[in-house]
């Protein structure tokens, strides 16, 4: 037996994230405040829906119909007072608690076409993302040290995925085949057009509709930029909420890569 101590380091560059939220043939949303779309050169506010027709994409508001080209990005003129709502966001995908709910988000709204469906993406800062993740993955009323630990772990996992994507994009395979078995693992590499999704597949992110406490924000500020590292590389810090008192090696659960800190 041995104890592996992982050093924490400050990550100086905290990037903007693109989080996939909603996947549907039609997306209904409400812009609360004034938003600008550079693609159309117009300003928008209020409730809209967008869908594909035989002639292309149609953005609708009440009786107004506007043909548009994708992608569309709606950017708030005032980040502090503006937000947007998405209707019928599916959470707990393929779990027994799967359901739809309406959610509210800060930041930019981007809509793209992924061929099988339209996708709504939230663009926001990493720390604002973590504010919701911590409140969604665990209780926002948990002790301060639990919240700090979760902040460091979630930040480390996310930045490790972003760093990994820079080196494996276009060459990564999430399965292994030999003569006797086919092994498939499900990871964030399944997402080609955004960094992470908002569900349990990556990290649970439910926008600002998920209640959080001042303690969550304090935990983020206290650990701002802190990540776990191993031999100079940010740790792929996997976590679970229900381990049953036992853990498993990383290479027995995901891709066949050995991480000594996840044995």
PLM feature spans:
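Conserved, single-site charged/polar hotspot
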Residues: 1-263
């Amino acid at each position: 037996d041995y104890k592996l101590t992982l050093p924490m380091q400050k990550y100086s560059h905290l990037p903007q994230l693109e989080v996939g939220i909603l996947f549907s043939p039609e997306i209904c949303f409400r812009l609360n405040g004034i938003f600008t779309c550079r693609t159309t050169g117009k300003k928008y506010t209020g409730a809209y829906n967008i869908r594909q027709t035989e002639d292309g994409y149609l953005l609708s508001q009440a009786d107004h119909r506007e043909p548009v080209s994708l992608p569309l990005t709606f950017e708030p003129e005032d980040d502090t007072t503006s937000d947007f709502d998405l209707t019928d966001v599916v959470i707990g995908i393929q779990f027994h608690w799967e359901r739809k709910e309406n959610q509210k988000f800060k930041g930019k709204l981007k809509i793209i076409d992924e061929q099988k469906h339209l996708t709504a993406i939230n663009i926001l800062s990493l720390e604002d993302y973590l504010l919701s993740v911590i409140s969604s993955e665990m209780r926002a009323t948990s002790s301060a040290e639990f919240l700090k630990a979760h902040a460091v772990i979630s930040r480390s996992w996310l930045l490790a995925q972003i760093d990994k994507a820079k080196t494996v994009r276009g060459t990564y395979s999430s399965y292994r085949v030999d003569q006797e078995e086919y092994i498939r693992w499900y990871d964030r590499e399944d997402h080609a057009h955004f960094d992470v999704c908002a569900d349990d597949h990556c990290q649970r992110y439910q926008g600002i509709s998920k209640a959080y406490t001042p303690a969550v924000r304090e935990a983020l500020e206290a650990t701002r930029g802190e990540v776990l590292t191993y031999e100079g590389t940010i740790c792929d810090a996997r976590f679970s909420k229900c381990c049953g008192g036992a853990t498993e090696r990383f290479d027995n659960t995901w891709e066949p890569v050995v991480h000594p800190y996840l044995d």
